[in-house]
Amino acid sequence: MSEAESLDRIDPSKFLGGIIGSSVKVKLHNGVEYQGDLQTIDGYMNVALENGKEVIDNKVTKHYGDVFLRGNNVLYISEN
């Protein structure tokens, strides 16, 4: 692998560790999306959000103080 190729790759655990406390979007396999402040994430992709919102079809359907998402349901996590 060339040096240029290795610079383009990001270790997901470093990325996820770097966005703790940031506003994130978590999409689940069933299409439901949660938005909130990332409090913690573990090696199984279990996620805890604070000030969470449930979003279905681009509409906020519920507000939560804390949201806990099981990792096997998570499709992706992105920083807002």
Swiss-Prot record:
Gene3D superfamilies: 2.30.30.100
CC annotations in GO: nucleolus; P-body; sno(s)RNA-containing ribonucleoprotein complex; spliceosomal complex; U4/U6 x U5 tri-snRNP complex; U6 snRNP
Protein keywords: Cytoplasm, mRNA processing, mRNA splicing, Nucleus, Ribonucleoprotein, RNA-binding, rRNA processing, Spliceosome, tRNA processing
Domain of life of the organism encoding this protein: Eukaryota
GO biological process, one term: maturation of SSU-rRNA
Subcellular location: Cytoplasm; Nucleus
Domain Sm: 11-80
Keyword Cytoplasm attributed: yes
KW Cytoplasm (keyword) present: yes
Main location: cytoplasm
Recorded GO MF terms: RNA binding
Quaternary data: Component of the heptameric LSM1-LSM7 complex, which consists of LSM1, LSM2, LSM3, LSM4, LSM5, LSM6 and LSM7. Component of the heptameric LSM2-LSM8 complex, which consists of LSM2, LSM3, LSM4, LSM5, LSM6, LSM7 and LSM8. The LSm subunits form a seven-membered ring structure with a doughnut shape.
PANTHER family: SMALL NUCLEAR RIBONUCLEOPROTEIN F SNRNP-F (PTHR11021), U6 SNRNA-ASSOCIATED SM-LIKE PROTEIN LSM6 (PTHR11021:SF1)
Function recorded in the entry: Component of LSm protein complexes, which are involved in RNA processing and may function in a chaperone-like manner, facilitating the efficient association of RNA processing factors with their substrates. Component of the cytoplasmic LSM1-LSM7 complex, which is thought to be involved in mRNA degradation by activating the decapping step in the 5'-to-3' mRNA decay pathway. Component of the nuclear LSM2-LSM8 complex, which is involved in splicing of nuclear mRNAs.
UniProt record similarity statement: Belongs to the snRNP Sm proteins family. SmF/LSm6 subfamily.
Protein name according to UniProt: U6 snRNA-associated Sm-like protein LSm6
